[in-house]
Amino acid sequence: MKLNLGCGRKHKKGYLNIDIQEPCDLKHDLRTPLPFVDASVDEIYSKDVIELFSLREWKKLKNEMARVLKPGGKMEIFCNNFEYAIVNFLSCKDEGLKWEYWLHCVFSGQGNEFDYCKNAFTYDKLVSDLKEEGVENFKRGFEPEYTGWIHLICQKKS
């Protein structure tokens, strides 16, 4: 089984698309335990989601992700890169663009009551957080449209 956590409108074929709002395959609040047995999931995909959780909520979610992921299971995460946002904010000469980017990166799109950032990550912070949950083999992914974002691919220890 493959999970797309916090899918929003970005549904992935071959994945169970989970979100707090419909349309999705499974409506579920990720602030609560995942409705799957231990070590039952082959892959977890999460794009633009983890920064929407408070520090306390993130600690619970990362624990749940590790709990349901099979040993050797893949995890792929995209999130805002706070370090990149700060550097760009300080170096950008276009005041409008500077604030538009900063507000979106730090506070998210604010399209609905769930679309607000409550957390921030750097690559090293995200890796450290996931190591606490028995995750290893970290690799940086790359997608051109996500320059300045963290794209992390890793797996749960076997």
Cite the ranges covered by each PLM segment.
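S-adenosyl-L-methionine-dependent methyltransferase catalytic module, highlighting the catalytic core
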Residues: 57-60, 64, 70, 74-157
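Conserved SAM-binding loop
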Residues: 2-85, 152-156
